[in-house]
């Protein structure tokens, strides 16, 4: 009944039924304005993969008058936030290579009151009850390590770049004409709205989302090379002043070796690394345990086998002795 929409959806989902359901759940969240789920949507993928059509459909579902475009800087600034009040959908198109802690984004999606400072009027505090949809070629890089952003972030990746000759310039108009059918389908499919919510939550820690985050955040990628042991008999935390470096014994040394091997300069301090570790491990479904010993903090973590081939210095390196 909505051939253009289904064709777009099938390509965006790579023909996978479970991915189709996640995209539909995201559209339902916009339609029903479920800002109270405290999630924000981030659609990533190469140019021409159908991301902008996703934003167009979301705008149609929210209603053109209820949607606005902004940048992530708008969300972070009390002066600029004034422009966002009164909308139920906030689109963030192409936040190219943005990096920051996302405090405003976290507060708005978390349902916290944020300060708004309009020109020529007194500042005040308010809630912004809107669903946020970011559309990016490259995923945003959040420096927040508390888990406040990752707990709310739903990444949906559109991997396939549609060849220019296959693109339909009339696609948006065709889908606009199918809107009534799309709305009816979403309302029927998610007559229990919690089904949509649980689909989005399961997407948060899906392999797809983890891989996108690994590509965007080197520290998060390093955590993917760790596995847990049944007891705290694994690597010690270590610190930067222990010489010579022992990459197999000390976790922090292994992290520094990973960053160096991959040419990353902005390493986390030991303190920030230690604070972020349990939160990032949790995203991989792993539990962090540690104990204090005479040799320092010992953890339940060890390096996976693939670390040795991918980036760990070889044994004949004198620094590993």
Question: What is each residue range found by the language model?
Answer:
Residues 19-23, 51-54, 101, 179, ...:
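Hydrophobic (often cysteine-bearing) scaffold residues that line and stabilize catalytic clefts
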Residues 88-91, 132-136:
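Conserved two-lobed SF2 helicase motor
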Residues 1-86, 154-157, 186, 195, ...:
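P-loop NTPase catalytic core of nucleic-acid-dependent motor ATPases
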Residues 80-125:
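Conserved nucleotide-sensing/catalytic segment adjacent to the nucleotide-binding pocket
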Residues 62-77, 99-102, 118-123, 129-130, ...:
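Positively charged interface segments
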Residues 54-57, 83, 87, 101-108, ...:
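Alpha-helical scaffold elements adjacent to nucleotide-binding pockets in ATP/GTP-utilizing enzyme cores
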Residues 59, 67-68, 176-221:
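Phosphate-handling catalytic cores of nucleic-acid transaction enzymes
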Residues 21-25, 39-42, 118-121, 186, ...:
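Short coil/turn segments at secondary-structure boundaries
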């Amino acid at each position: 009944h909505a051939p253009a929409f289904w064709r777009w959806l099938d390509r965006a989902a790579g023909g996978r039924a479970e991915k189709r359901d996640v995209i539909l759940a995201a559209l339902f969240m916009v339609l029903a304005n479920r800002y109270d789920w405290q999630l924000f949507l981030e659609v990533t993928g190469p140019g021409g993969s159908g991301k902008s059509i996703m934003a167009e459909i979301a705008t149609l579902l929210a209603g053109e008058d209820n949607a606005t475009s902004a940048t992530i800087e708008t969300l972070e600034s009390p002066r600029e936030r004034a422009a966002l009040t009164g909308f139920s959908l906030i689109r963030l198109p192409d936040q190219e290579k943005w990096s920051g802690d996302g405090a405003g984004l976290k507060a708005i999606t978390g349902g916290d009151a944020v300060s708004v400072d309009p020109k020529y009027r007194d500042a005040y505090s308010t809630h912004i009850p809107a669903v946020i949809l970011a559309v990016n070629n490259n995923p945003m890089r959040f420096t927040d390590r508390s888990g406040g952003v990752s707990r709310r972030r739903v990444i949906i990746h559109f991997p396939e770049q549609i060849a220019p000759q296959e693109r339909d310039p009339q696609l948006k108009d065709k889908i606009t004409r199918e809107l009534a059918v799309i709305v009816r389908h979403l309302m029927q499919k998610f007559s229990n709205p919690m089904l949509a919510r649980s689909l989005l939550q399961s997407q948060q820690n899906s392999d797809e989302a983890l891989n996108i985050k690994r590509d965007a955040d080197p520290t998060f990628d390093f955590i993917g090379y760790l596995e847990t042991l049944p007891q705290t008999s694994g690597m010690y935390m270590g610190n930067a002043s222990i010489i010579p470096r022992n990459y197999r014994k000390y976790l922090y040394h292994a992290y520094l070796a990973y960053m160096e091997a991959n040419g990353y300069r902005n390493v986390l301090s030991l303190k920030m690394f230690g604070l972020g570790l349990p939160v990032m491990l949790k995203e991989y479904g792993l539990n962090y345990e540690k104990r204090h010993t005479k040799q320092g903090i010992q953890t339940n973590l060890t390096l996976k086998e693939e670390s040795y081939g991918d980036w760990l210095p070889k044994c004949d390196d004198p620094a590993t002795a």
